[in-house]
Amino acid sequence: MTVKIEMNPVRGIRTFPAFPVVLAVVGKEERNIITLALVHVFSFNPPLIGVGIMPSRHSHELFHRSPDFSINIPGKELVEEVIFCGERSGKDVDKFEKTGMTPIPGKKIETPSIDECLVNFECRKVQTFDTGDHTWFIGEVVTARTVEGYDRERALIYWAGEFRTLGEIIRGR
């Protein structure tokens, strides 16, 4: 029998192999970029994506007030911008200005997306619910855009305090 070591449940959750990293944008006038690893596809039909945000974060209130948001998948070349947006509060700094990332107007929502990201999803907020120490904001994807020749190997993931890219493909389904 394989020997297993018991661990604290929170530490156990952090052993999940990887979480995608996204830059979420919320708001038109008072906008902010937040780095998130709690992101999940909740449904394919209709297409629903959710992000989990702690109530103590500045973006939490902005997400509550806004009818929409964008989810943006950054490539590995944006790792410094991703870290900056995760370490600074939007209360204190305009993250678009400080990072040099470019807001692009939404096609179907008021909130901008990030031009430099590999993939942009425009989402209309359809549901909000609290789970433990996070609030989940669920959005229906109303527009999706990707760079031509999108290579998912460039997308950032987060695991055990490290930003990574995808690894070896073992086998197709």
What residue ranges belong to the model's regions?
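Basic, polyanion-binding surface patches
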Residues: 1-173
